């Protein structure tokens, strides 16, 4: 049973993904791709703002992952703008919290200042979860600032036509030729 049950369940789920779920999802993705490729600049900026805000809403939670999965799905259709907006916006919360602990040291205790250093490094790697301790401690101030910052970042990214072909990597994707 230890070997058979996982094998059978993987087979059932895999076949369901291919034959039941795959075709409708492919159709939806094709429609979204067509819409993205034909939209004007204003709509692209709005999409960037929405995706950017989603990336910062729960910092690694389901809303964040939905935006990320959307961007990764578009990579297969060679639509690279949304992924750039998603990655740039996803880096906002940890970078903002890390910079805040350095700029306004007196507003943070020693443990938070150390957490800010870690958040800064995680932010450079596109790991949003570095900002969670700050958001958990003061959600009414941290979350709105991060969401607005992420939305602005996503909008700017789409407005300038930034493109990203890598699904992850943060600042380190700049090293890829």
Where are these regions (language model features)?
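Pore-lining transmembrane helices
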Residues: 1-177
């Amino acid at each position: 049973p230890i070997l058979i049950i996982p094998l059978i369940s993987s087979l059932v789920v895999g076949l369901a993904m291919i034959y039941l779920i795959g075709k409708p999802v492919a159709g939806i993705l094709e429609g979204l791709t067509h819409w993205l490729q034909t939209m004007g600049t204003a709509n692209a900026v709005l999409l960037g703002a929405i995706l950017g805000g989603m990336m910062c809403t729960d910092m690694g939670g389901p809303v964040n992952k939905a935006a990320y999965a959307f961007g990764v799905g578009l990579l297969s259709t060679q639509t690279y703008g949304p992924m750039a907006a998603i990655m740039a916006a996803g880096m906002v919360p940890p970078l903002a919290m890390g910079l805040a602990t350095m700029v306004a040291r007196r507003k943070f205790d020693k443990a938070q200042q150390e957490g800010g250093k870690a958040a800064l490094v995680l932010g450079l790697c596109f790991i949003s979860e570095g900002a969670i301790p700050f958001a958990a401690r003061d959600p009414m101030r941290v979350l709105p600032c991060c969401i607005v910052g992420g939305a602005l970042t996503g909008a700017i990214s789409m407005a300038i036509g930034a493109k990203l072909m890598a699904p992850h990597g943060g600042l380190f994707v700049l090293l890829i030729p």
